[in-house]
Amino acid sequence: MIAPLAQFIDWSALQVAAMIPSIRKCARGDSKLTEAVEFLNGPNFIPAESKPAALEFKSKIHFTFPSPRLCEFVENNIVHGRLYRRAKDWRKFPTLILLHGGVDFVTHRCRFPAMVPAIHRAGCNAATLVAPYHFQRGVRRVEAFDHLRVAEAFGQGVAEIRALTGWLLNQGCPSVGLFGYSLGGWLAGLAATSDARLKAIVLALPGVRRNYRATHGEGILWTPMRKVLEKQTAAREALDKTPLNLTLSQPVLPKENILLMQGRYDLLVEPELSEEIWQTWKQPEIWRLPHGHLSWMLTRGINRRVLDWLAPRLDPQAISEKGTH
């Protein structure tokens, strides 16, 4: 895609995002920075121990489980997800967990379900998770998300990914992989720095740290939002000195099992960030796509390419058996 069109799509999305209530709440929450930094630098951000989730199925596909990291809001303490089993003997196959972007209802509700048939053909089950404070887990009565609440939400999201991973492995799945886009890629990256049970990960245009162009307010036309974001530069710089910044940690799985996807025309998460993590993570495979943060989804054959990359890494034996079921 030509750069001007890709960037116009991103710019338009940025204007819409600036008006979304949950985004505005995050922008207004410039408090509890000291507590957030202490939490992120402490052992409770991503604890060593992770217990398997206790899934309860509401239908053949939809499930819930109690979050392993509780907060004061009942709505956010219940994790919602979907499991798309490949076959009746689904436990014999790897599972790919799909993680959506921030306030990214379209990917979660439309793109991910559309990917399921291809994932099944690749010999895998598919699962999705709703990130903290998103969709069914939204909390309207919060006036502002301060820095501590945002930090805790990141820790909660990682804990929930690890809990679902534990449940899948306990069920007998030979391996678990992650595909995360934007915010989901950031959460997948954090999980990959702490959980060696993960077999392979794909970080598609991931967030890497708190301080980037969109959080500076660059390109936002709505003046009140832009000014609020501009005032938080020092806070973001402080947060970027903690393990929330992916470039300050190393993954615990081999770099051969990590795939980075970059949008060369990305206006929301600039490509320099993926280059930075590519270098600090010892140069795993990276695909530099001629697209923006949103238009990369239009790349012809991208799902097939990703699944062709993932399939042999998740479990070669299970993949070789896929044609028999």
PLM region spans:
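Alpha/beta-hydrolase active-site loop
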Residues: 145-171
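Acidic catalytic loop of the alpha/beta-hydrolase fold
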Residues: 264-269, 294-295
